[in-house]
């Protein structure tokens, strides 16, 4: 099965409306860069989320995951409120492309949090997955993750002066040197640990 990435943006009159929407107003699953997270208030709230799928079927059902890290190559950020960037689950309709309704497929359990203030630009930034995040990795299929702001995860309304942005390279950028990646360390039934890297 193939995998993909995409970003989704929506606008609402208030915070609860915009994060509770079923479908995004716009989406992009073909750009070389995309909004990983985005929250901003003008006269209405604007929120973006992103989805990343990785084909991890080569791990195999008999193996055990010990460590896992998702890394994204950041290209731009803006920080006002100092929110976190959170890895969550996702469950898009397709494993090969986006629909607007995928906006609401992201979960509300954080698998990894990194402060937006600490994100480095023009560099990979690592999100080490906790036990729930590792459990979300498919041993025989496609592993489905996404990104939200910390306040989007907890449904906590930011101050109207808040503005948080993070943009990163997507799989469609030229080459693989900046691709989103999932690095998994797993144990074979009888052999030593093995590291494998997947690019989406």
Task: Locate the predicted segments by residue.
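Flexible, small-residue-rich N-terminal segments that precede or flank a structured functional core
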Residues: 1-56, 92-96, 104-108, 112, ...
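Extended extracellular/luminal ectodomain segments enriched in beta-structured repeat modules
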Residues: 46-49, 59-70
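Surface-exposed acidic, glycine-flexible loop patches that form ligand/cofactor-binding
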Residues: 57-64, 133-139
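A short beta-strand element within beta-rich, extracytoplasmic domains
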Residues: 54, 64-76, 182
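Active-site-proximal beta-strand/loop segments in catalytic clefts of secreted hydrolases
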Residues: 56, 72-75, 90, 148-151
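Extracellular beta-strand ligand-recognition surfaces/modules
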Residues: 137-160
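Beta-strand-rich interaction/scaffold domains
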Residues: 8, 12-13, 75-143
